[in-house]
Amino acid sequence: YGATILADYTAPSDGSTQAYVTYIQNFSTSYPEMNGLLMSSASGGGGETVLNTLKSLVDPGTIKICSFDTFEGMQEGFNDGWLSCLAGGIEIQALFDFVMLYNAVDGHPLADGYTVLYQNFIFITSAEDCENYSKYISNPEYMIYDADTIQSMTVRYNPDCTLKTLTDIMDAYTLESVVATATE
């Protein structure tokens, strides 16, 4: 993609966000040409800390953040030009893991042996995406899948259910599909 890695850091695992402040201050001083940050995780206060640190060091949009995970203030971050992309939405993975377990315990395993399920990320690239993400995906009051869809993933309620039934539902999971279903 034409990116040049100028430096890297290890995200703190102790819950402290001060290390983020130090890293970002050092990077912006050592690499004034730096125009982006790729964060492998913005959870645990990392996203908020990096964004606030950048705000104190450079003009909006000078250094853009692209990250896995979502965080408080992301909508404002897009509006103000600090963010270019966030990847999230994997909270739903637990449903598919549970469905695999449920079918197996119910005597109808969907696969022989160990199976890897790949969950789509939801890519957020604008403030509007943030609004929809917050309203429909990270909102515990909203059900992404209704009872009929969940039952369709089980052999007990859908004798034609297969692993492909489940993976087709997983593959169709996008921000656009969730919003379309919600607004029908």
Give a label for each model feature:
Residues 1-184:
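A residue-level marker of the well-folded mature domains of exported/periplasmic proteins
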